Amino acid sequence: MTLLADPNDLRILGAYSARMAAGDTDAVYDTFAPDFKSHVTARVRPGAEPGDIRPHEATWWASARAAFPDMKFRVNLLVHKDDLVVSNWTLQGTHTGAPFFGVAPSGRPVEINGTAILRMRGGKVVEHWGGPHCSEGIGLGGARFDAA
């Protein structure tokens, strides 16, 4: 099994991560194909209809930025095989902003770790599986938090 990364895919995902960490939700439109399919979005974001779901992805990131104004997002690991990239990531911040998934700001630091499996085609993400590993960090317990 070859675990060598396609430099272009890794560059694209690295730029996406940096832009999202900076609050640039337009990165969703530049990185994800219009027919991007998330195996997570419809389940955790009621109202996300089939079709272009990039607006739902951008809204999720905007709500995370509003809840965690000091948000930092980093990619810990990227593994590439054929057209798939596996990413392990960490989102850190302090919940001092807006409510997040209905949870009022706690003022506490939060660290959310997750894993994403992304299918790449033509320099765009076309399919996604995965999400956060847990949601206890902000008191959500068993709440539906499997967002992309």
Please report, for each region that a protein language model flagged, where it lies by residue.
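C-terminal and inter-domain tail/linker signature
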Residues: M1-A148
